[in-house]
Amino acid sequence: MQGSQTKRTVFPLPEFVEESYAVICDFDGTVTPFDVTDAILERFAHPSWKTIEDEWVQGNLSARECMERQIPLIGAKPGVLEAFLDEVPVTDGFVEFTRFCRSRDIPLTIVSDGMDYAIRHILYRHGMHHIPVVANRLIRSRTGYQLEFPYGREGCPSGVCKCSVASIVAADSKCLLIGDGLSDCCLARSASFTLARHGKSLQRHCAEQGFPHQTYLDFFDILEAFKAPVPQPYAMPAAVLPAV
């Protein structure tokens, strides 16, 4: 496996890793190497989904409005969709990272602006039934698919308000955010520390805003960081991981 053969850049984590903390982990592009929702749309949706995507990119639609219009365009039957999800890999080191968290009693929650059905299918296929999932709810009916937003909040453009979820999940502890994209940027403001996938929008946002963060290539990097001695006092390292 590539992750176990690559020389790791070990970076220090802040002091709170020895205290009570909770891990909030994104899914699409974080737990998986690519955005699963976009891959499903690309493969199975009417081509007009791209026009809706462009409207979102231009700022004319919120992320929630965008997904609400795109998901009904998916034409795959449930069995075909399941077969597609069976082929979706997880990012190198994620399975090992979940085992590490479980062995240390570290609360790990998947909080995603994607589809709960796809997330659970992929996690369950890898034997990870125990991980809590907070995501938009995919509804299947005779007429097709639609999305519900049980974790949305008025005034939040996302389907899942990650800030609201984190305030509950990590109410009595520090919040460690692991993510990659735009849906993670708001939570990065209040998270105690952020692990941002190298070269993605979350990394750029944290750097521009001066939020405490470090980059990673895969979950083997994160595992190495957790196992490394915590420096005293903590200081943000200047080193950046190599480009992908």
Task: Show which residues each predicted segment covers.
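A general, composition-driven signal for non-globular sequence regions
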Residues: M1-Q2, C156
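C-terminal cap/substrate-recognition subdomain and adjoining C-terminal extension
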Residues: G93-P107, G114-V244
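Alpha-helical substrate-recognition element adjacent to the catalytic core
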Residues: Q2-R137
